[in-house]
Design a protein with these regions (language model features):
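Conserved binding/catalytic microenvironments
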Residues: 322, 352, 359-361, 367, ...
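C-terminal, non-catalytic "cap/extension" segments appended to globular domains
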Residues: 125-132, 270-277, 364, 372, ...
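Active-site recognition of the HExxH zinc-binding catalytic motif
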Residues: 228, 355-375, 396, 401, ...
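Long, K/E/R/D-enriched contiguous segments that form extended
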Residues: 267, 271-307, 313, 317, ...
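Catalytic zinc-binding patch centered on the HExxH motif and its immediate surroundings
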Residues: 290-292, 325-347
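A well-structured
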Residues: 1-287, 569-573
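Post-HExxH zinc-binding segment in Zn-dependent metallohydrolases
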Residues: 388-416, 423-425, 429, 501
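Short pre-active-site segment immediately N-terminal to the catalytic Zn-binding motif
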Residues: 290-294, 345-365
Length: 573
């Protein structure tokens, strides 16, 4: 199957409507039974209330998963999505009191409940740890109702606007995904032309896109002020369960080694025979670029996963066979790729925009890595499944490494050169580029006032050039390329999580290949199965690593240097 089968969630919209109305009533009953009464409950009664709360949250997740997936297939159908956002607000409002009232219990009572509810102790402890950022019940209610007219509304506007963009190219109207795939074309004229055409469309929409990112910035500033967050990014670190110190250390390590980016691209310029490497040359193919149709990629991924773990294979096989994956680009379909965790009574759903390129093979592996992680995390209860972004991206990048290792032994030298170059560029995109994005966001959100397009462009160019140093010439057209990146809109300060995951995976994968950890596979599957029920520090600690140690990041960076050295040796043979 090449398109989603959403019947695992709901058979039709009527079933969705009936389920939603039932859950609204259930949430009203929950509010009636427990609001202003938590302090009167004994431990068994509180555990039952907690499970009821969890079930209602899972129902919410199920409703919005179905609605969001329909929207992702056709982003012009925003009214249906908005309708159910409003319906779900009714449920959310009825549940709003629970976490707030738990945090207001006496320390003795909250500790008694936390100790008794062993399966939820990490979740409850986190609530207590961050309760200083809570507002009053009435204030939280106002925030809830305003949320769909704030950043969420601008996120939807961004999605609808970007998916509607058509880029004129050689007599055709291309989507964002289709024109960006031209950046990998071997013909420099095509790359240059595609970059110019895409830039022109972004520039044409710059007023709208600049306004959207300014509104995201303003709302984040206001929420930080209201909740008492120390800065615009701290709420992301809290949800990622990582310290500001650890994030700063990660960024400093990346910046310290920007020379690896420069080293690689200078060699690439030599290989291509160019006097100057431009921004549209970054992904120019080296050697023979292999093409992978979806069937070929499916078989490669399944074989690579099978070689690592039968569990990985079984989950991926089900994804291919049972309508978990929506494969090809379509008009009005959301761009990019994702794996949505959905709920444990269904299964994850993967969105692709597959165009038979080598990078599509690795995108497939990446998203199925998420799928495997999400499916394994169904082993813990719904409130414990919410994995921090830092560890959520680990499984996806690890899956890419499995596929890279699997196919590199099966390629000819010319294809191997291309594979190595592409893998290194993928690592740069996942590590260094995400640090570049985070530094761009830091500067953007540090500005008090609304920024003009020109001011945003300037910050973007300055931060981008730091990464490339003198190895890549950024043309003036590149100045607007911040404006199509969805993470800046949907999830501010998300991007460092990719960098974190990349270095963590390189450290883990190096440990796996070294065979120094005899039970690595069992430990790794256990780590994924724990979902968000323990901290990232504890998860990584299972392998003997300490993410708070600033030297930890150097382990992954050494693996990047090793890959670059292997590429250099291969190229000089």
């Amino acid at each position: 199957m090449l398109e989603w089968d959403l019947s695992a969630l709901f058979h039709d919209k009527e079933a969705l409507q009936n389920f939603t109305q039932d859950q609204i009533q259930q949430s009203l009953n929950f509010k009636k039974n427990y609001e202003n009464k938590l302090y009167t409950l004994n431990t068994n009664e509180f555990l039952q209330a907690l499970k009821d709360y969890e079930n209602l949250n899972q129902a919410l997740g199920k409703i919005m998963t179905y609605v969001y997936l329909l929207f992702a297939k056709n982003t012009q159908n925003g009214s249906f999505y908005a309708q159910y956002e409003e319906e779900c607000k009714k449920i959310e409002e009825n549940l709003l009191f629970f976490e707030l009232e738990f945090c207001e219990l006496t320390p003795e009572k909250s500790q008694e409940f936390t100790t008794f509810c062993k399966d939820y102790d990490f979740y409850l402890s986190n609530l207590l740890q961050n309760k200083r950022y809570n507002l009053s019940k009435n204030e939280e209610r106002i925030m809830l109702y305003l949320s769909n007219t704030g950043a969420n509304a601008f996120s939807r506007l961004f999605d609808e606007s970007m998916s509607a963009l058509k880029i004129p190219f050689e007599g055709k109207k291309l989507s964002e995904e289709e024109v960006l795939s031209k950046m990998y074309d071997e013909d420099r004229k095509i790359r240059k032309k595609a970059a110019k055409k895409f830039s022109k469309v972004l520039q044409k929409n710059s007023r709208l896109l600049s306004f959207i990112i300014n509104m995201i910035k303003t709302e984040r500033k206001n929420i930080s002020l209201l909740r008492g967050y120390e800065n615009a990014e701290i709420s992301r670190h809290i949800s990622n369960q990582i310290s500001q110190k650890s994030v700063d250390s990660l960024i400093a390590s990346a910046q310290k080694h920007f020379n690896l980016v420069s080293q690689f691209y200078k060699r690439k310029k030599q290989i291509l025979g160019y006097d100057e490497l431009k921004d549209y040359d970054r992904y120019a193919p080296i050697g023979k670029e292999a093409s992978f149709d979806f069937k070929t990629s499916k078989n490669i991924v399944l074989e690579a996963f099978q070689a690592f773990s039968p569990q990985f294979y079984d989950i991926a096989k089900n994804a291919f066979d049972q309508g978990w994956i929506d494969v090809y680009p379509q008009e009005n379909k959301q761009g990019g790729a994702f794996s949505h965790s959905a709920t444990s009574d269904a299964h994850p759903f993967v969105l692709l925009n597959y165009t038979n390129k080598r990078r599509d093979l690795f995108t497939l592996a990446h998203e199925l890595g998420h799928t495997i992680h999400q499916k394994l995390s169904y082993n813990v209860s719904y409130l414990n499944q919410n994995t921090p972004l830092t560890t959520a991206e680990t499984a996806s990048v690890f899956a890419e490494m499995l596929v890279f290792d699997f196919i590199k032994d099966k390629l000819k030298k010319e294809e191997l050169l291309s594979l190595y170059a592409n893998k290194i560029e993928d690592i740069f995109a996942t590590f260094y580029r995400q640090i570049n994005f985070t530094c761009f966001e830091r500067r953007l959100h540090a500005q008090e006032n609304e920024l003009s397009t020109e001011e945003i462009n300037k910050i973007w160019m300055e931060e981008s050039q730091k990464m490339f140093q003198d190895s890549v010439k950024l043309t003036k057209n590149y100045a607007s390329w911040w404006s199509y990146i969805p993470h800046f809109i949907h999830s501010p300060f998300y991007c460092y999580a990719y960098a974190y995951a990349q270095l963590l995976v390189l450290a883990l994968y190096g440990l796996y290949k070294s065979k120094k950890c005899e039970n690595f596979k069992e430990l790794y599957i256990k780590m994924l199965s724990l979902g968000g029920s323990v901290s990232p520090k504890e998860l990584v600690g299972m392998f003997g690593f300490d993410i708070e140690d600033k030297n930890f990041w150097e382990i992954g960076i050494k693996e990047i240097q090793k890959l670059i050295n292997e590429f250099m040796e291969l190229q000089s043979c």
